[in-house]
Amino acid sequence: MSDIEIRLEPHDEFNHKPDEASNYNESMYFNVFDHSKKMGGWFRLGNRPNEGYAEMTCCIYLPDGRIGFMFGRPEISTNEVFDAGGMKFEVLEPFKTLRVRYSGKILLLENPKDMLNPGKAFKENPRVNCNADIEITGISPMFGGQAVRKDGQPLNQDPEKSFSKAHYEQHTAGKGTINIAGDKWTVDGLGLRDKSWGPRYWQAIEWYRWLTININNEIGFMFSIVHQSENSERRGGIVLKDGRYETIKDCKIETEYDEDNFQKTFTAWAKTDDDEYEVKGQVLSLIPLRNRRTTPDGESLVTRITEGMTEYTYEGIVGYGMSEYLDQVIDGKPIGP
């Protein structure tokens, strides 16, 4: 019998005292998609207080295929709040209601693949004003938390090989407004949010596939395949049905890629204790992102993350969400299947 359990308390919605690890990260992420307008976006703040900065990302998928994108590493002096670079997250009621706001510049990309060369993309595409204000409401239970020993002691982790020590997710609804360069949209959609904390290097995982899916208010999915090494791969996720979660015990994803090795279409299968599921995905709009780090011995590491607004079909019903594919890049090529 395992002496490890998953714990999640309302106070975990607020920020924690950082570990001593230099790469301590505490992050929140939200996505929301308006099914009728076929638009939406995602917002992320990752505090790295021991390094003195936050990672701020705003990504908006517009109905005409353009993408508004901004990334920054604003300085921070505390981990007590998520408020950096024009982005702010507030917990109004733990597990139930949160608020997402962004006010600042955004890069307006006619061709999102320009981000294959970020330096060139930021020089050649216009920066315009963006304001977003969205209230997020949970429509599901919480999933996840922190793995601890039953006596309350945390598990020992090597910070150099860590992606997080705690993680949870929740399917959500989102209502609010997005204003870009004077064009305003009222958003009434569905999505998913997550939170993680603990030491993180983006290079700690060889590759992963993460699908967030909202078919409607009653049906949703999250598929996760995390390949940490040849001998370590985790496949799982959740099915939202009738207001409760079923845990995915196993899953697989078969992907068709385009000429740039970006996900184009795919089929995902999942097994729970009670049922089996098949969901098809077609990417509508995608932006390629990357993270680079130089190790202490001078090795240059490159991680590619492709973020696709995706149309999903389950039993003939159409929904929307994200497909996020992370790969380490070796000899110029992503290493995942």
Which residues does each predicted region cover?
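Structured soluble/peripheral alpha/beta segments that form catalytic or ligand/cofactor-binding pockets
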Residues: 1-337
